Amino acid sequence: MKWHLKCSTLVVKLFIASVLICLAATPSGAETTPLQELIGRANDQVAKFVEQFSDVKCTEHVTQEKFKADGKVELKEESTYDYLVILTNAGGEISLDESRLAVHEQRKDEKKGVSMLVSNGFATLFLVFHPYYSSGFEFTDLGEDTINGRKFSKVQFKHIAGMRSPAALALRGREYPLDLAGVAWIDAATGIIGKIDAGLATSMEDIGLKSMRSEVQFQPVPFKNSKDTYWFPAQASVEVETPRQHWRNTHNFTDYKQFSVSTEEKVASK
């Protein structure tokens, strides 16, 4: 994940680190709780989803809003992109990178002193439940909830200080691991994630970041030539506040299509 501010002296970037293929094993003979079994199913789903997500492209519509001190919108910009996530695998290390090709970019309102938030990568918040990262979080069962008529298990997550985190804040040449905390709505039977709400477990106002909240909603996407139905991000919203500024970006993802790209390396014979 990344975000940064345009036309501002403060530049903030949020990175999701590379993901390693690492399956956590349960000690032989150890009994597992229902919550551990649910997290295990979510681990399996996310590990598969990382590869599924890189096999599709979609249309992304981004709405950027900057708010005044009284809460009214000061500036609003809208853009549309062809969007895809590029997956690379080198020696067992998986890296996810977003690619955006502009379809429509609103003509920028050149207001002096007005900065806009640019947010990238928040659709991949599901990496909290990837096997490589989930051991760095505490999970709590919050019972059941219903979204659009479908039952989900609500699971609270909180990053354990000192453990690996899928996100880090890069600011003025330094990187700060982020202590993410939030709630995920997970299908109890399949481990499919329907929604994630996340933010900072502790304030980072001392370095210029007062608060950050992000919500990602997932929806089932059927494909013509596939018997399986996959759940992909439908909307990702990001709200960021510094002591003096307030932004909200909303990313809507539509028109998912499958595609495949194969590359072949040939060495010319002498």
What is each model feature region?
Residues 29-181, 188-195, 199-235, 239-270:
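Structured extracytoplasmic
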Residues 11-25:
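Bacterial N-terminal signal peptides
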Residues 1-12:
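N-terminal secretory signal peptides that target proteins for export/translocation
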